[in-house]
């Protein structure tokens, strides 16, 4: 299914897109019920705005939007899942687990009341900000920003993977345990009353 209209509004009883592709080349709003988006499967691409709100969601599909806004209580992304944004990626919610890819060609910002964990990648070409109650990055995980990166963990930040910034990197946590890589092309600032760097690289 392909549409070049400025806005695309789909009012459907249900949508099955497994193995299929929906392409919206307009720059307006992609109108589809959040419940149908997260159950549809397949690939969904829009050059416009895509808003997804749900209490919980497990994603193993590929979704791309010009501007992607997520408000997900409990979010889990498998290794096959990809959420991509061209201009901006904004995410809010509770507990998030990412084993896939979260990416933006512009800015990426996540504000979580719970934890962020997993072995997946989160990357932006612009500024990157992630604030959560806790951060737990696995051995294969990476957080990368093409400009400045700001991380905040209300409690514990555990890094076994790679956290990098082309610009400044600022990480703040009540306790920071680094077993991986923390690096910035500009300034590196770690704000943590308790800091452990065991076989890690700063």
PLM regions: where:
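Short, T/G/N/S-enriched strand-turn elements that build extracellular solenoid repeat scaffolds
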Residues: 1-3, 17-24, 39-45, 57-64, ...
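Surface-exposed loop/turn motifs in large extracellular/passenger domains
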Residues: 3-11, 25-34, 46-53, 66-71, ...
């Amino acid at each position: 299914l392909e549409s070049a209209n400025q806005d695309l509004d789909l009012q459907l009883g249900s949508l099955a897109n497994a193995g299929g592709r929906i392409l919206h080349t307009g720059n307006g709003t992609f109108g589809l019920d959040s419940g149908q988006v997260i159950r549809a499967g397949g690939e969904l691409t829009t050059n416009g705005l895509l808003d997804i709100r749900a209490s919980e969601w497990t994603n193993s599909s590929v979704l791309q939007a010009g501007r992607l806004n997520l408000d997900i209580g409990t979010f889990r992304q498998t290794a096959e899942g990809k959420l991509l944004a061209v201009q901006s990626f904004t995410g809010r919610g509770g507990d998030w687990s990412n084993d896939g890819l979260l990416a933006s060609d512009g800015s990426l910002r996540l504000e979580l009341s719970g934890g962020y964990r997993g072995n997946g990648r989160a990357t932006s070409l612009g500024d990157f900000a992630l604030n959560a109650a806790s951060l737990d990055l696995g051995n294969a995980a990476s957080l990368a920003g093409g400009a400045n990166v700001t991380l905040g963990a209300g409690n514990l930040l555990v890094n076994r993977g790679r956290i990098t910034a082309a610009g400044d990197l600022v990480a703040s946590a009540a306790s920071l345990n680094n077993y991986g890589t923390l690096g910035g092309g500009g300034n590196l600032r770690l704000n943590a009353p308790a800091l452990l760097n065991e076989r890690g690289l700063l």
